[in-house]
From Swiss-Prot:
Protein source organism: Enterobacter sp. (strain 638)
Coiled-coil segments on the chain, per record: none
A cellular-component GO term for this protein: cytoplasm
Gene this protein is translated from: trpB
Protein name in the entry: Tryptophan synthase beta chain
SUPFAM superfamilies listed in its UniProt record: Tryptophan synthase beta subunit-like PLP-dependent enzymes
């Protein structure tokens, strides 16, 4: 099929879907390309981001975390966005696209529940029906977000197959869409999946990096030495990285979840520890068994518990433009507690992975003068019960 936009990032990406979905993807690509050139669409999207979601979000300088060091650390506060995370940015864009295509229903998948909440709020606002697939295990560990979705009128459908987590929810959502795309739009939650989703999601998250660049230049008069973001599927990270890719002086650092440790096999770090394969409609690194079956991923944070990664991250890694590292559950939990106690900000466990790596960089060389920005992709209200149970089991509370 001829596409309007390049479906690949280097060797990664593509449209590996059943033939039945090709017309839906083509229609979506056409709607996106025309919307990008339509001033009325852009004006409505910008208005929603500003007056409904609360953009621009703050760039907060840490007062206490860097004390006694020569690092200056800023947090890009996506946690302050309506809905509690960066997810709200791109769902507003996709919901407007759905309406532009004449769709009346939204199908979505969610892991941590943040994309589900964002999808539910966008549908409530714009008058769309909403059904959300969520792994049964994730429903258990993210009950506040499940209730939020239902409060806003969404139908939350538990998925019991496989590991009952995000990858299984993705499979069910795609299955649903293949039979309902005449009336429904699949609102994919991350910068992964078949073309054109990775490009659409990046463009609808790009303002994170654009705002960060303008804000840091205003506050510090120069670009940061590095921007750091957690990577599951990779939407918050690509939103932060996109506007800095051509600024080669700026390091791009993506942080995957090492879970219980890479050597344990219980992690979610396919970029550095997976093999290239085809899954979820794309060619990208993924966690596989020796037989080529998709392996279960694991992370303390439901939003990073995904066995593959967006194709643009795979490309940035392959050409050496971005560096990808990993952080364990314990390191993320420590960073979570550190930010709470030292700055009065409760971060999402996902974002805590990025913060943990920044703190590691600072600790390794306290005398190094460096300007760092961490994308605080979401707030941690959804995680307080998980953290409470862990700390209680350890006798820390």
């Amino acid at each position: 099929m001829t596409t309007l936009l390049n479906p690949y990032f280097g060797e990664f990406g593509g449209m590996y879907v059943p033939q039945i979905l090709m017309p839906a993807l083509r229609q979506l690509e056409e709607a996106f390309v025309s919307a990008q050139k339509d001033p009325a669409f852009q004006a409505e999207f910008t208005d929603l981001l500003k007056n409904y979601a609360g953009r621009p979000t703050a760039l907060t300088k840490c007062r206490n975390l860097t004390e006694g060091t020569k690092t200056t650390l800023y947090l890009k506060r996506e946690d302050l966005l309506h809905g509690g995370a960066h997810k709200t940015n791109q769902v507003l864009g996709q919901a407007l696209l759905a309406k532009r295509m004449g769709k009346t229903e939204i199908i979505a998948e969610t892991g941590a529940g943040q994309h589900g909440v964002a999808s539910a709020l966008a549908c409530a606002l714009l008058g769309l029906k909403c059904r959300i697939y969520m792994g049964a295990k994730d429903i258990e560990r993210q009950s506040p977000n499940v209730f939020r979705m239902r409060l806003m009128g969404a139908d939350v459908i538990p998925v019991h197959s496989g590991s009952a987590t995000l990858k299984d929810a993705c499979n069910e959502a795609l299955r649903d869409w293949s039979g309902s795309y005449d009336t429904a739009h699949y609102m994919l939650g991350t910068a992964a999946g078949p073309h054109p989703f990775p490009t659409i999601v990046r463009e609808f998250q790009r303002m994170i990096g654009e705002e960060t660049k303008a804000q840091i230049l205003e506050k510090e008069g120069r670009l940061p030495d590095a921007v750091i973001a957690c990577v599951g599927g990779g939407s918050n990270a690509i939103g932060m990285f996109a506007d800095f890719i051509d600024d080669t002086s700026v390091g791009l650092i993506g942080v995957e979840p090492a879970g219980h440790g890479i050597e344990s096999g219980e992690h979610g770090a396919p970029l550095k520890h997976g093999r290239v394969g085809i899954y979820f409609g794309m060619k990208s690194p993924m966690m596989q068994t020796d037989e080529g079956q998709i392996e279960e991923s694991y992370s303390i944070s439901a939003g990073l518990d995904f066995p593959s990664v967006g194709p643009q991250h795979a490309h940035l890694n392959s050409i050496g433009r971005a560096e990808y590292v990993s952080i364990t559950d314990d390191e993320a939990l420590e960073a979570f507690k550190t930010l709470c106690r030292n700055e009065g900000i409760i971060p999402a466990l996902e974002s805590s992975h990025a913060l943990a790596y920044a703190l590691k960089m600072i600790k390794e060389d306290p005398e190094k003068e460096q300007l760092l920005v961490v994308n605080l992709s979401g707030r941690g209200d959804k995680d307080i019960f998980t953290v409470h149970d862990i700390l209680k089991a350890r006798g820390e509370i």
